[in-house]
Amino acid sequence: MKISFIEPAILLYAFAMTLTIPLTAQYVYRRIWEETGNYTFTSSSNVSECEQNKSSSTFAFQEEVQKKASLFSLQVEISGLIPGLVSTFMLLSSSDNHGRKLPMVLSSLGSLGTNLWLCAMSYFDLPLQLLVASTFIGALFGNYTTFWGACFAYIVDQEKEYKHRIIRIAVLDFMLGVVTGLTGLSSGYFIRELGFAWSYFIIAVVVLVNLAYILFFLSDPIKESSSQIVTMSCSESLKDLFYRTYMLFKNGSCKRRSLLCLLIFTLVVYFFVVFGITPVFTLYELGPPLCWNEVYIGYGSALGSLSFLSSFLGIWLFSYCLKDIHIAYVGIFTTMVGMMLTAFTRTTLMMFLVRISFFFTIMPLSILRSMLSKVVHSTEQGVLFACIAFLETLGGVTSTSAYNGIYSATVAWYPGFVFLLSAGLLVLPAVSLCMVKCIGWEEGSYTLLIHDEPSEHTSDS
């Protein structure tokens, strides 16, 4: 008998992703350090091998390593851009007819293959450039936005009432905060006690368990239409997919289309900033003046992951006195303050304290997705989240590529510049939300917007 709880799959995937990101960043950093300096990277119990005297040759060497690590991360992200965009859009769009499990299964297979390859690379000390090839192949199966988009659409399929949906998403954010916080906290100890190869192997085992749960225990609320599969060729299915995407923006009133476009713009720009700055945090903490080791990096990652937990509490508390749009404002402005403070942080204590200002960072993402789900019909949820995941994939790769490029160009004269730039970019989603408010967004007004039933969009020609 199959069950309809998507939460275990989300939590297992979150554990794997939260552990993979800091591990890979530090693995690349150490490999480039050793290849550039021709000697082994070491770390003490307090700080990494780091020189803070700017006149020292070691300081110049560290800056060179940071530049190379940033540029290599740029190559890796770009390699997965095109296949990730295509696979994400096609898998999530087709999930309205073929079920939500297919995108979850394929993206999990991609994650499994990538982590097994990283395990082999670190164990056999294979050339670092092979990571670019594995990223490209893994992206053909989808990526994290494919998985999250399918999971969110799965929840929307089950929870028809908006209030129940918000509660379930908020509880999920709470659980994600606990899992990612503990994972981030332990990431440094994984590296120190087990090394990179065994850490990646453990991640692969977790992904395999998650894959088994999705395949054999998770039910699918979307029933596959066998008649449509028989009568529609591959080209007709692709044509139908793009036509339904076109109808998503064509259907409805001008107000509905305006709200849809503005909310998507707000979500994508905010995601661009928040996701793009994440890998830079690790490089910023590894270099001077902080010079953190893998354990401190884990502490910082754990504090950052607490934003899931604190965002859940924030949504729960603020929902009693604030509207959705105002809750999103709170998250945007506190994140903006955190970016500005990070740019001027020079001590470990201050860096930990600055993380507090990021505690509501996840709130706008959860609120904006819920607001978007209000303005489309239930039969358009898959197409909507396919568009969102497509844009998030594009924005995620573009942002990490841009931030890595900017950081490598500015680290020598001012490492904190990217954080000031991020604070400035966050003005855009704030202004966009103002426009949403001016158009006339009201809590509950979505019931009028989705009464425009989507017209038939099967491709007959």
Swiss-Prot record:
Catalytic reactions of this protein: estrone 3-sulfate(out) + n H(+)(out) = estrone 3-sulfate(in) + n H(+)(in); 25-hydroxyvitamin D3 sulfate(out) + n H(+)(out) = 25-hydroxyvitamin D3 sulfate(in) + n H(+)(in); cholate(out) + n H(+)(out) = cholate(in) + n H(+)(in); glycocholate(out) + n H(+)(out) = glycocholate(in) + n H(+)(in)
InterPro entries: MFS, MFS_trans_sf
GO biological process, one term: vacuolar transmembrane transport
Annotated motif Tyrosine-based lysosomal-sorting motif, positions: 446-449
Signal peptide per UniProt: 1-25
Transmembrane spans: 71-91, 104-124, 136-156, 171-191, 198-218, 261-281, 302-322, 325-345, 348-368, 382-402, 416-436
Topology within the bilayer: Multi-pass membrane protein
Annotated Gene3D superfamilies: MFS general substrate transporter like domains (1.20.1250.20)
Keyword hit for Calcium: no
Keyword match Transmembrane helix: yes
Extracellular side: 26-70, 125-135, 192-197, 282-301, 346-347, 403-415
Alphabetized UniProt keyword annotations: Glycoprotein, Lysosome, Membrane, Signal, Symport, Transmembrane, Transmembrane helix, Transport
One of the Pfam families matching this protein, by short name: MFS_1
Location of the protein in the cell: Lysosome membrane
GO (cellular component) term, any one: lysosomal membrane
Glycosylated residue positions: N38, N46, N53
Cytoplasmic face of the membrane: 92-103, 157-170, 219-260, 323-324, 369-381, 437-461
Task performed by this protein: Lysosomal proton-coupled steroid conjugate and bile acid transporter. Preferentially recognizes lipophilic steroid conjugates or bile acis as endogenous substrates and seems to mediate escape from lysosomes to the cytoplasm. Modulates hepatic cytosolic copper homeostasis, maybe acting as a lysosomal copper transporter and sequestering copper ions in the lysosome. Delivers pathogen-associated molecular patterns to cytosolic pattern recognition receptors as part of the innate immune response to microbes.
Alphabetical list of PANTHER family matching this protein: LYSOSOMAL PROTON-COUPLED STEROID CONJUGATE AND BILE ACID SYMPORTER SLC46A3 (PTHR23507:SF9), ZGC:174356 (PTHR23507)
Family: Belongs to the major facilitator superfamily. SLC46A family.
Protein name in UniProt: Lysosomal proton-coupled steroid conjugate and bile acid symporter SLC46A3
UniProt source species: Rattus norvegicus
